Every structure is written in C-alpha cells, then in structure tokens.
C-alpha cells in the first residue's frame, strides 16, 4: 500500500463510489475520527457501517478536484445518488497519518442531501432489496 496522501485519498473515494467497502477498510486508521453535518464518530468500524448504509443510494463519486497540503487532502466530488437529490456536491478533508486516513471532515448542504437521507432511512427500514 502506498503512503502517498493523494493516492490514499483517491483510492478511498473511488472504492466508496464502487461500494467496495472491503477495499476501504485497510485505508482507514482503526481510531479514525469523523466529523460531518449532524454526526461525529470515532473508529473505523462505526464509520464503515455508515458508509455501507449510505451505499444504498450511492451510485458513484464523480471527483472534480483533489488538493493536497502535506498530509492533508481535500477531495471535491459529486456524490451521485439514485434519489431525487441526484448529484450532491461534497467536500472531504482527509488527514493521512502512517499511510491511513486518520480523520475525515465532511462538508455538504444538508438541504440538498435531504432526499437522499430520506431514501437511506426508508431503505434501511425496508430491509435488504431482492
């Protein structure tokens, strides 16, 4: 595994967009810190659970720009959903330490994301799709 912060960040975003959360897991520090609109988590396992849950509506990540400053990487992308929300602009500020993502700061418009949030909840309550 590369320790280049930009490569790690892009691998993470691409794997998330493919819903390949098994590929995401080794990119995360076990004690990862996550801060986003309405949510704060500590630990890779709870964060992966959230990613898997939102995977229900996640079609792909359409990366627009990747900015780096040492161990900090900012990824700007459209979170493309299969909901009326469509593509929601997202910014993730990732801190890479020891070749793994140590922290994630997530920024997005909660109003624009609401149709996706509603659908995530509905699908979680409905159980697995057949």
Regions found by a protein language model. Name each.
Residues 1-130:
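C-terminal and inter-domain tail/linker signature
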């Amino acid at each position: 595994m590369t320790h280049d912060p930009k490569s790690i960040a892009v691998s993470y975003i691409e794997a998330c967009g493919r819903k390949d959360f098994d590929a995401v897991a080794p990119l995360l520090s076990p004690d990862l810190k996550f801060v986003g609109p309405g949510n704060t988590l500590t630990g890779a396992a709870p964060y992966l659970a959230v990613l898997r849950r939102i995977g229900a509506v996640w079609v792909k990540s359409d990366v627009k720009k990747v900015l780096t400053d040492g161990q900090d990487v900012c990824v700007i992308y459209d979170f493309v959903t299969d909901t009326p929300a469509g593509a929601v602009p997202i910014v993730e500020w990732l801190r890479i330490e020891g070749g793994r993502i140590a922290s994630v700061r997530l920024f997005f418009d909660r109003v624009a994301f609401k149709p996706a949030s509603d659908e995530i909840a509905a699908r979680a309550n409905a159980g697995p799709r057949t």
